[in-house]
């Protein structure tokens, strides 16, 4: 009997196994209800404490509504939430030209300053020539509601409507042998230098003016001309404007009986190699010489060196090369609004390297900062007219000097060099509190063009 009872128990156990298995393994939806991780609930004291962003959103993951409860301000909540969700899209400063970046979820928005547009404020709206010169490489003028670019002589406008392309190897203003590593730049301290007006001179010196300059290597000042008197001596400088025209100062012409010109030289001590070019005519103000020989420019004031400008016409054309290139003639607006608002200009010459010392045999060059008109006028006992401007250093001993008169004051813009001034006069050379005074070429553009058009 016992064996039969044991067999019945075993059969009953085996019969019940499938039912037991089905009760242990639950369906996924039912199981998930039991296996979910419950969020820690705040304690009674946490619920009554003010919202804390670190507790709510850093230690734990929070919702936007929880963040809003902390900030209690919709704008602050949006700013935080945009960064919290996917990081700060503005961290790389994507907005150009000082645009303001606002972060978003998966994006950002740039708010641009006036005259700029684009997703990153990268597009400049050149509606005015006063904004980066209308993006023009040379000259800019406003035509209706747009800007229109044009170029100096011997250049053509590029296909982009902004750039200027040289049409020849010796187009004006091209420094073919660029200064590269020897760039004549302003010393760092000059940028913060303030003008101090010191002791004034008793007399102006008309025959200025390169003190403490560096050597200008061959081809680095290709527009430089040198005026030679009947004794074969250097007495003034000049600027090549065309194959037959050299710009100089009017007061230079009254210093000698005859004038010859040298170009393309950096060392005039080697007289056997230099070539003197003959002069055909000189156009200067009538108060210097008989009117039947010179072109008349009205109102020249010899005492104040006002209208200190003259043009020499050559008998035979100057042969251009990489060492002999004319400076470009700017428009008046371009000179006043762009060139003369640059930090500095370049002055060169063979004048005296120290006050009352011999002239230099080698061509010297310096960079001189522009001086604002008010400071310029206060620094001098003599009249600074509208036809003049100042350039130079208040305390640094660098300046033009005797023998440099008539030479070029050049300003570079986008790798093109324009004539902006004529070395005219000064009170000594590189004197503390004094500046070099230059003829303002922009005032004479129509006169220069008229003279150059004469046959």
UniProtKB/Swiss-Prot annotation:
Glycans are attached at residues 92, 254. The lineage of its organism: Eukaryota, Metazoa, Chordata, Craniata, Vertebrata. Residues 210-453 form the Peptidase S1 domain. The keyword Hydrolase applies. Heterodimer of a light chain and a heavy chain; disulfide-linked. Gamma-carboxyglutamate residues are formed by vitamin K dependent carboxylation. These residues are essential for the binding of calcium. The O-linked saccharides at Ser-92 are a mixture of Xyl-Glc, and Glc along with smaller amounts of Xyl-GlcNAc, GlcNAc, Gal, GalNAc, Xyl-Gal, and Xyl-GalNAc, suggesting that the glycosyl transferases responsible for this modification are non-specific. It comes from Tropidechis carinatus (Australian rough-scaled snake). Disulfide bonds join 57-62, 90-101, 95-110, 112-121, 129-140, 136-149, 151-164, 172-328, 216-221, 236-252, 376-390, 401-429. Belongs to the peptidase S1 family. Snake venom subfamily. GO terms for cellular component: extracellular region; extracellular space. Snake prothrombin activator that attacks the hemostatic system of prey. This protein is functionally similar to blood coagulation factor Xa. Induces cyanosis and death in mice at 1 mg/kg body weight during blood clotting. Residues 21-40, 182-209 form a propeptide. This is Venom prothrombin activator trocarin-D. The active site is at 251 (charge relay system), 308 (charge relay system), 405 (charge relay system). Residues 41-86 form the Gla domain. Keywords: Blood coagulation cascade activating toxin, Calcium, Cleavage on pair of basic residues, Disulfide bond, EGF-like domain, Gamma-carboxyglutamic acid, Glycoprotein, Hemostasis impairing toxin, Hydrolase, Protease, Prothrombin activator, Repeat, Secreted, Serine protease, Sialic acid, Signal, Toxin. Its EC number is 3.4.21.6. Residues 1-20 form the signal peptide. The modification 4-carboxyglutamate is found at residues 46-47, 54, 56, 59-60, 65-66, 69, 72, 75.
């Amino acid at each position: 009997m016992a064996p039969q009872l044991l067999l019945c128990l075993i059969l009953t156990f085996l019969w019940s196994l499938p039912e037991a298995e089905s009760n242990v393994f639950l369906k996924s939806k039912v199981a998930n209800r039991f296996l979910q991780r419950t969020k820690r609930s705040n304690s009674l004291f946490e619920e009554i404490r003010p919202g804390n962003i670190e507790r709510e959103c850093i230690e734990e993951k929070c919702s936007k509504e929880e963040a809003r409860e902390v900030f209690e301000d919709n704008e602050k909540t949006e700013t935080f939430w945009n960064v919290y969700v996917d990081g700060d899209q503005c961290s790389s400063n994507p907005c150009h030209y000082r645009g303001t970046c606002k972060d978003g979820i998966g994006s950002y928005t740039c708010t641009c300053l006036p005259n700029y547009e684009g997703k990153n404020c990268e597009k400049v709206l050149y509606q005015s020539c006063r904004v980066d010169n209308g993006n023009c490489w040379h000259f800019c003028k406003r035509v209706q509601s747009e800007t229109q670019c044009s170029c100096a002589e011997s250049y053509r406008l590029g296909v982009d409507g902004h750039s200027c392309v040289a049409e020849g190897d010796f187009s004006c203003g091209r420094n073919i042998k660029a200064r590269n590593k020897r760039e004549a730049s302003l010393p760092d301290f000059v940028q913060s230098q303030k003008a101090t007006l010191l002791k004034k001179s008793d007399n102006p010196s008309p025959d200025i003016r390169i003190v403490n300059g560096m050597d200008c290597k061959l081809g680095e000042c290709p527009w430089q001309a040198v005026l030679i008197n009947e004794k074969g001596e250097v007495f003034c400088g000049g600027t090549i404007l065309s194959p037959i025209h050299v710009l100089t100062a009017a007061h230079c012409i009254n210093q000698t009986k005859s004038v010859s010109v040298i170009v393309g030289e950096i060392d005039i001590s080697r007289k056997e190699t230099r070539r003197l070019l003959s002069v055909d005519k000189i156009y200067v103000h009538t108060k210097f010489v008989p009117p039947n020989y010179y072109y008349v420019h009205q109102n020249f004031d010899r005492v104040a060196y006002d209208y200190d400008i003259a043009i020499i016409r050559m008998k035979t054309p100057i042969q251009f090369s990489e060492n002999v290139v004319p400076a470009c003639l700017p428009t008046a607006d371009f000179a006043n609004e762009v060139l003369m608002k640059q930090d500095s200009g370049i002055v060169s010459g063979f004048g005296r390297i120290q006050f009352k010392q011999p002239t230099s045999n080698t061509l010297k060059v310096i960079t001189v900062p522009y001086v604002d008109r008010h400071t310029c006028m206060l620094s001098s006992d003599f009249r600074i007219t509208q036809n003049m401007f100042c350039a130079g250093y208040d305390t640094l001993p660098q300046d033009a000097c005797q023998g440099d008169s008539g030479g070029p004051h050049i300003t570079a813009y986008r790798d093109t060099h324009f004539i902006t001034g004529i070395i005219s006069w000064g009170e000594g050379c590189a004197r503390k509190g004094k500046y070099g005074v230059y003829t303002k070429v922009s005032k004479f553009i129509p006169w220069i063009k008229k003279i150059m058009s004469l046959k």
